[in-house]
Curated annotation (Swiss-Prot):
Residues 379-390 have a biased composition (Basic and acidic residues). Belongs to the shugoshin family. This is Shugoshin 1. Ubiquitinated and degraded during mitotic exit by APC/C-Cdh1.
């Protein structure tokens, strides 16, 4: 027994046992899944016969079909209800639209009837009220003018039943006899023309008699009533103005003619005022433009004076570091700081004083003028052709000299115009004069390399100028170049590229075949 215990099982045997156990478990699980249980059967009752199982299945199917039919019937009923409700909603909306149309048609009919029936009555009532008010106001003015100046008490103005219904401060008409219809639009703003009609007579009377000034408020209120009634019913009875003017002429023709004259002259006066204002504005603009043009002309004159008075040295001095941001330089050449012109000490002093004066004048002219800002170097640049800056001469590369040296120092053939004769004639200077005197620019020219025979024979031959190596031609290309341009089989540049380099093994048989042929 001890020996058997001591004997250990191999690893493979243990693995086989584990595999067998796993297979058994899997088979059990598959057998349990394969068994089909009925839905209605209780867990305690397990059917054994196939006949009983078939019965159970049939009963379940019948129940499912009945439930399905019930659900379908319910859905149909719900759909019928939805359709009926939609029909009712559509019918109600149609009724609503029809009622709205009827309402709008009735309102339009009522408005047309009101417009047709009412205006005659309204116009007649307005005529009566305006006649009474205008007659009473004019009569009271005449009576007050004839009264004695020593009289302290004034007769109280008679209040008519028409005026009781009007509220002047609020601007609303509350007449007791007749009310305006709803459709008539009422404007609360008064026109200036009607206010002029009412107030013109009162102003004339005030100038004549001082007593009228006290009772002017009462008259103004009455006249306002007339203007309010006229203005508010302007849309209804525009044709009634002639009748009102005729009635007022019958009462007091002299004063009404005066008011009419004043009214007719009013718009002309307004137009004349507008014209005067326009003329004044135009004159002010012209004067401003003249002042600006004068200031600009003065500044230009100062500039020209500065240019004429300054010598070429100051002109060259003006062209300085400011030219870095000046892009208007076209033909001028920037002189180097080592190539300035030489002048005597007295000339320099006078030039410096002149330049200071010119700078001050330019600054004052800039303050006065409204022109665009320009850099200071721009103003000193517009000088004559004779007074240009010193340009750098070209190096004469093409010239050949008989000496055998590779390099030479050659003086320029054309000396600059502005340099005095001393600097041209004295190339050799002492150490003291080097800093003050401008030496002539010396150009180092390299001798072109030529064969020795030609160097000995030809003394000086002008070679062709050096040009740009790349030349762009805009001519129409030839047919061959057109064909080769984009075609990978005929394009030479494309075929010469390393992509199309064939291998050595591919080239050898081709050569051999050519040799054999």
């Amino acid at each position: 027994m001890a020996k058997e215990r001591c004997q250990k099982r191999s690893f493979q045997d243990t693995l086989e046992d584990i595999k067998n156990r796993m297979k058994e478990k899997r088979n059990k699980n598959l057998a349990g899944i394969g068994k089909r249980k009925s839905f209605i059967v209780a867990p305690g009752q397990v059917p054994t016969n196939t006949a009983t199982l078939l019965r159970y299945y049939q009963d379940n199917n019948r129940l499912l079909v009945l439930a399905l039919e019930n659900e379908k019937s319910k859905v149909r009923e719900a759909q019928d209800v939805i359709l009926q409700l939609r029909k009712e909603c559509y019918y109600l909306t149609c009724q609503l639209y029809a009622l709205k149309e009827k309402l709008t048609s009735r309102q339009s009919e009522e408005t047309t009837q009101n417009w047709k029936g009412r205006p005659s009555d309204v116009v007649s009532s307005i005529d009566n009220t305006t006649r009474d008010l205008s007659g009473k106001s004019l009569q009271q003015i005449a009576v007050e003018e004839t009264d004695c100046p020593y009289q302290t008490t004034e007769p109280s103005p008679a209040v008519t039943p028409e005026t009781q219904g009007c509220d002047f401060d609020s601007g609303k008409v509350e007449s007791t006899d007749e009310v305006l219809p709803r459709t008539i639009s009422i404007r609360r703003h008064l026109r200036k023309d009607f206010s002029n009609i009412s107030h013109s007579t009162t102003l004339e009377d005030c100038k004549a008699s001082p007593r009228v000034a006290q009772s002017l408020e009462v008259k103004g209120s009455r006249c306002r009533e007339v203007t309010v009634t006229l203005h508010r019913l302007e849309n209804v009875c525009l044709w009634n103005k002639d009748q009102i003017s005729l009635c007022s002429r019958l009462i007091n023709p002299a004063k009404i003619t005066e008011t009419e004259v004043i009214l007719s002259s009013k718009p002309e006066q307004i137009e004349s005022k507008h014209k005067r204002a326009r003329k004044r504005r135009a004159e002010q603009r012209r004067t401003k433009q003249r002042c600006k043009s004068k200031s600009s002309l003065r500044s230009k004159g100062n500039k020209n004076k500065d240019k004429q008075g300054l010598p070429p040295t100051t002109l060259d001095g003006g062209i300085g570091s400011c030219d870095a941001y000046d892009f208007n330089l076209k033909g001028t050449v920037h002189p180097t700081p080592f190539r300035q012109k030489m002048n005597n000490g007295c000339n320099k002093e006078t030039d410096s004083s002149n330049s200071e004066v010119s700078d001050l004048e330019c600054s004052t002219s800039e303050d006065e003028s409204d022109d665009l800002y320009l850099p200071p170097s721009k103003r000193l640049r517009d000088y004559r052709e004779s007074e240009r800056a010193v340009t750098r001469p070209r190096s004469k590369r093409g010239l050949q000299y008989p000496d055998g040296k590779e390099r030479k120092e050659v003086l320029p053939s054309t000396a600059p115009t502005g340099i005095p004769p001393e600097t041209q004639e004295s190339p050799r200077c002492s150490l003291k004069d080097v800093t003050n005197i401008l030496q002539c620019p010396r150009v180092k020219i390299r001798k072109p390399s030529l064969p020795p025979k030609r160097r000995e024979d030809s003394p000086a031959v002008a070679l062709t100028k050096r040009r740009c190596s790349t030349i762009k031609s805009y001519k129409e290309p030839t047919l061959a170049s057109k064909l080769r341009r984009g075609d990978p089989f005929t394009d030479l540049c494309f075929l010469n590229s390393p992509i199309f380099k064939q291998k050595r093994g591919m080239r050898c048989p081709k050569r051999r075949t050519k040799q054999t042929q």
